[in-house]
Amino acid sequence: MLARTDSTNAEALKLAPGLSGSAWVLAREQFAGRGRRGREWVMPAGNFAGTLVLRPQGGALAAAQLSFVAALALYDALGLACGPAARLAIKWPNDVLLNGGKVAGILLESSGSGPGVQAVAVGIGVNLAGAPDAGAVEPGATPPVSVQGETGHAVDPEEFLDLLAPAFARWQAQLDTYGFAPIRNAWLARAARLGEPIIARTGTAESHGIFEGIDDSGALILRGPAGRQVIPAAEVFFGG
């Protein structure tokens, strides 16, 4: 447990060359955390900022599939932390929702590229004690919530890691043993807005349609007016 760091992902990738297996990096305070597309990840005191650094089996695709492993592990850990009354769902590509609001996010970063991916940092942020101000998020984005705010449960970051780490290990073993198919099926069973209208935005386009699922690579499948689209990377917004 680090008292303070700029980014647990950056810290984890510094450790990677000396690792033979995997390791978790956890920080009480993270002052330069990042989300997707370089966005700042705001971390109020008492929240979870952690990274698992590991060497993936395979290249870039296998590394990317760890995002789905992380989402399933978060779903399980949050289920234990929040209790049976909590409504949890996974939002493509990298968020976990609690009672309809964003409670956790995932960011993968790697060293090396293509078939030469040397290490992957699976960064995970969870709003345990508090959520960022809703006014700080992009218009139309899912509003942030916290575990304590939604359930009244006070969960320490180290206690949460005790729930998350074994859950990640279980799902990673599924991926390593059986491939992506069971991970994909489990993810779809927990997916938010499956079969419902969504909006997928890339840097240059916006697509409206029905969220039909994900393909064997984890890409979004959208059924719109022009037919079926497979979208490898985008931001998803609900409604419309």
Swiss-Prot record:
Under Enzyme Commission nomenclature, its number is 6.3.4.15
Q: Which GO terms describe its molecular function?
A: ATP binding; biotin--[biotin carboxyl-carrier protein] ligase activity
- One Pfam family linked to the record: BPL_C
Q: Which reaction does it catalyse?
A: biotin + L-lysyl-[protein] + ATP = N(6)-biotinyl-L-lysyl-[protein] + AMP + diphosphate + H(+)
Gene Ontology annotations for the cellular component aspect, listed alphabetically:
cytoplasm
- Domain BPL/LPL catalytic spans what residues? 1-176
Q: Which Gene3D superfamilies does this chain map to?
A: Bira Bifunctional Protein, Domain 2
Q: Keywords, A to Z?
A: ATP-binding, Biotin, Ligase, Nucleotide-binding
Q: Which GO terms describe its biological process?
A: protein modification process
- Which residues does the record give as biotin binding sites? 7-9, 30, 34-36, 102
Instruction: State the similarity comment.
Output: Belongs to the biotin--protein ligase family.
Q: What does this protein do?
A: Activates biotin to form biotinyl-5'-adenylate and transfers the biotin moiety to biotin-accepting proteins.
**NCBIfam families named among the record's database cross-references:** birA_ligase (TIGR00121)
Q: What is this protein called?
A: Biotin--[acetyl-CoA-carboxylase] ligase
> What organism is recorded for this protein?
Paracoccus denitrificans
Organism placement in taxonomy: Bacteria, Pseudomonadati, Pseudomonadota, Alphaproteobacteria, Rhodobacterales
